[in-house]
Regions:
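C-terminal capping/extension of enzyme domains
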Residues: 9-10, 14-39, 43-44, 55-57, ...
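Short secondary-structure capping/junction motifs at helix and strand boundaries
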Residues: 86-87, 149-150, 171-172
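Internal catalytic-core helix/loop-beta-alpha segment
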Residues: 109-166
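Short, conserved, surface-exposed binding loops centered on an aromatic residue
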Residues: 40, 102-105, 144-145
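Short, surface-exposed acidic-centric catalytic microdomains
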Residues: 62-130
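N-terminal nucleotide-binding beta1-loop-alpha1 segment
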Residues: 49-52
Length: 224
């Protein structure tokens, strides 16, 4: 009975864990938005995905990274790791399976945050080109919390450019290529790289199957 009580307690904690940064949400005013999510940084993370900034909250279907139901990030991850683009999709509720996503990312060592901690939206949409960076993220502070990190992954032009500026990376990598991040090694002395992937946004003109192939190549490279 004690065992099942512990299981129920664990499930309850998993279901009620909040990834919202309530302090940042409260600070957001006069057109400046502070990042509404806390960094998701599993201690075993080898990959850190850095976007630009979450879309407006009205577009969210869950309180986590890549929350827009029409963004295909979680469909890509489902296809890469489980051969099923709908593995993390709850079609009836039109949302993603948050508990499954969190457990998966913790197991695989996949971390998430964004290259901007505070932004101003020049238009009321999710397009990166209408984001003004007010406060870039302290990327070095994130890296310091990820001793096994091998790659920072960006999937958009804005995020890539912001990261290159922040980390003094002299050349912006083309899509599906990577470059070393200067003076950045993990705890094993391995070079940390910036790997640029195609955007998971449906506005990016590439078939989902091609995006899946690109993401699979990246994960395969890091798992060698």
């Amino acid at each position: 009975m004690v065992f099942f009580s512990l299981i129920r307690t664990f499930v309850y904690m998993e279901q009620t864990t909040s990834y919202l940064n309530k302090e940042h949400i409260a600070r957001s005013h006069h057109g400046v938005e502070y990042h509404p999510l806390i960094p998701f940084l599993p201690a075993n993370a080898k990959v850190l995905f850095l976007g630009s900034f979450p879309p407006p909250h009205k577009r969210w279907c869950m309180d986590f990274y890549y929350p827009n139901f029409i963004n295909d990030h979680w469909r890509i991850e489902g296809a890469v790791f489980f051969g099923d683009r709908n593995y993390f999709v709850d079609e009836d509720a039109k949302c993603f399976k948050l508990a499954d996503i969190v457990a998966f990312c913790q197991e695989k060592g996949i971390a998430f945050f964004d290259t901007s901690t505070a932004i101003r939206r020049l238009q009321d949409n999710a397009s990166d080109k209408f984001l003004e960076v007010v406060e870039p993220t302290d990327i070095c502070a994130l890296i310091a919390r990820l001793p096994q990190l091998q790659a920072i992954v960006t999937t958009g032009e804005k995020a890539t450019e912001t990261l290159c500026t922040s980390m003094n990376i002299p050349s912006i990598p083309k899509v599906n290529t990577y470059v070393p991040i200067p003076n950045t090694l993990n705890s094993h002395g391995q070079q940390v790289v910036l790997y640029r992937l195609p955007s998971s946004s449906r506005a990016y003109p590439l078939a989902l199957e091609k995006k899946v192939e690109a993401y699979r190549r990246m994960f395969d490279l890091l798992n060698r």
